Amino acid sequence: MARSTFFSFHYSLDCWRASQIKNSWVTQDRKSAGFFNSVEWEEVKKKQDSEIEKWIDGQLVGTSVTVVLIGSSTAGRKWINYEITSSHKKGNGLLGIYVHNQKNSKGLTSSKGKNPFEDWSITRNGQKVLLSSIYPTYDWVNNDGYTNMGTWIEEAAKKAGK
């Protein structure tokens, strides 16, 4: 089943890597959201926070899964955090994919970043549960994301009841 998927990533550092992943995704007859050109993002980020939140919320409409592309500096970023919390509240399936081993436009890899799901928790049965214990993470290179991302997304959607 084709899924409409929102991709969350650190735009200035990981845009090229994200674009490579997106291109592999759409060549497999999939739909993606959360990808936009640099001109669009430059315009959006000039707006007030409430307008940026509204724009992100609009990007999430119609999606069933959110994939957080985890680079060296993804965790803790304001808009990444907003996209994670909004996706969780919306009931989207979530997963993370480490992209540090994916080469950038200069052929370089980067250091592994912190799992952004470690910064968030929910309460279940009176107990604090980290999102990192709920949502899986994978490595794009080491776990063969090109071949397996569709399966990961489908599993996340099913886990979320989508």
Where are the regions that the model predicts?
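Conserved beta-strand-loop-alpha-helix hinge of the TIR/SEFIR fold
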Residues: 59-85, 93-103
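Short, glycine/charged-enriched secondary-structure capping and boundary segments
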Residues: 20-23, 81-84, 109-111
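Anion (oxyanion) recognition and catalysis
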Residues: 88
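Short glycine-/acidic-enriched loop or helix-start segments at secondary-structure transitions
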Residues: 17-18, 78-79, 106
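C-terminal interaction surface of TIR/SEFIR-family domains
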Residues: 4-6, 105-162
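Conserved nucleotide-binding/hydrolysis micro-motifs of P-loop NTPases
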Residues: 12-14, 101-104
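Conserved beta-strand termini and adjacent loop/short-helix elements that scaffold enzyme active sites
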Residues: 36-38, 97, 132-134
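Conserved N-terminal substructure of TIR/SEFIR domains
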Residues: 1-62, 145-162
